[in-house]
Amino acid sequence: MIGIAIPIKRLQFAKSRLAGVLAPAARQRLVLRLAQHVINAARQATGSFTMPARIWLVSADPAIAALAQASGVEWLPDRCEELNAALTEARKQIQNAGAQTMIVLAGDLPLVTAEDVAALYDALSEADLVLAPDQQQRGTNALALRLPSPLPFLFGLDSANRHVAAATQLGLRARLLTTPTLAFDLDDSERLRQYCAAERPA
């Protein structure tokens, strides 16, 4: 079984870097819209997998729990409210549910496609860790790993390099997967502008 985890902050804290251009209510609506897009991409990808898959939203926010229920996916309560700790706990629960593979997708990937998610899984045939970096090649927008795995989650500053370094130190085969749609996230006002321009009808 494949477990797909989509971590999402509490809405009140999400997308704080966009506070200068979006009001709190607008940021919350954006987060929910992005999360729904990522859920849809993950769900569409499961049809191409060679084994069953389950999708979990990892969050402390009751609104995200409601989104999970409305979307027909599962919710893992985030009791840590720190991304790496939350994903470590999620990995335990996903592995206990019988998963042999875990895919982590950031919840703010407005362009991610089902093909991207499937590519993460397919790339594991020749690796123990597959990592999709952001546009700067520093952050981690998505990753896939075989379970069980000793790899620590190292999301945060320069996480792409730190994940690869940790995998190498553990003797794990790491592979980078770079696509424009996986690399694009909404972490600043310029990318928000680009996203809105692309969404605007011609």
Curated annotation (Swiss-Prot):
Report which superkingdom the organism of origin falls in: Bacteria
The answer to whether UniProt assigns keyword Nucleotide-binding to this entry is yes
**GTP-binding: is it a keyword of this entry?**
yes
Q: Offer an example of a GO molecular function term for this protein.
A: phospholactate guanylyltransferase activity
Q: In which pathway does it act?
A: Cofactor biosynthesis; coenzyme F420 biosynthesis
Q: What is its EC number?
A: 2.7.7.105
Q: Which InterPro entries match?
A: CofC, Nucleotide-diphossugar_trans
Any Gene Ontology biological process: F420-0 metabolic process
Q: Which Pfam families match?
A: CofC
Q: What sort of enzyme, by top EC class, is this? A: transferase
**Binding annotation for phosphoenolpyruvate:** 140, 156, 159
**Catalytic function, reaction form:** phosphoenolpyruvate + GTP + H(+) = enolpyruvoyl-2-diphospho-5'-guanosine + diphosphate
Keywords of this protein's UniProt record, alphabetized? GTP-binding, Nucleotide-binding, Nucleotidyltransferase, Transferase
Extra information: The exact nature of the substrate is currently not known. This entry has been annotated based on its similarity to Actinobacteria.
- Role noted for this protein: Guanylyltransferase that catalyzes the activation of phosphoenolpyruvate (PEP) as enolpyruvoyl-2-diphospho-5'-guanosine, via the condensation of PEP with GTP. It is involved in the biosynthesis of coenzyme F420, a hydride carrier cofactor.
Q: What family, per the record?
A: Belongs to the CofC family.
Tell me the protein's name. Phosphoenolpyruvate guanylyltransferase
The organism encoding this protein is: Chloroflexus aggregans (strain MD-66 / DSM 9485)
